[in-house]
Amino acid sequence: MVAKETARALRAALDVIEDVGGLGLLATNCGPDHPPNSRVVKAHLLDSKLDTVYIATNRYTDKVQELAKNSLASVSFYTNGASAGDYVVLRGKVTRTIDFGNEKKVISKVWRDEDMLPFFQGGPQDERFCLLEFKPHEVSLISAKHNVAAKDNGWRPAKLERVMEEGAGCSWRLREDDISSDRLRRLRGAYDADGRPLPE
């Protein structure tokens, strides 16, 4: 049962990312005296897995400089339209920066002339072009489409955590957050998880 729920949550997360075309918000840490910095990015998933996310960028941008100082980051995705309200937040670490010289195979899977040539006129060999390799260690999500943590007044997203590397990938498991009944009562107000008034 747990394996089935985990697989459904992973499928839901992948669907949200696919539904928004990979467009998400990357948040990086700017240091102790500054708020986090966020910007819109396009996430690329190879082989339809959440193990590794690639983000194309210019190596001279603020995000690359910030990640060189603190590699922890998050990428958030939110759907609109038919499945409005479904969201995914990936929390993890940028493990390396990839350029054409060290990973031609990965770059060839991500590079699209129509998307990237306006920014990198020299093509994938442009010295400014690089990929950030982001490894999520936690996924938070809500998906009404897949009935994952989707109660109207639930206030508890499903959480997946990365547990073990397995050769070419990793495995994930659903994590149950320890939340007090008092905190849930405050989050939900005078209503149950389905949004119905609680009896007096």
Where are these regions (language model features)?
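Short Pro/Gly-enriched beta-strand edge/turn motifs at strand-loop
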Residues: 20-26, 112-117
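Short, structured beta-strand-loop surface elements
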Residues: 62-117, 123-129
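Short beta-strand segments
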Residues: 21-59, 65-67, 73-79, 86-93
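A generic "binding-loop/recognition-motif" signal
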Residues: 59-60, 137
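Short solvent-exposed loop/turn micro-motifs enriched in small/polar/acidic residues
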Residues: 19, 36, 124-127
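A short, compositionally biased
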Residues: 17-22, 70, 135-136
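C-terminal edge-of-domain segments
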Residues: 119-200
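Extreme N-terminal tail/first-helix region
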Residues: 1-25, 192-194, 199-200
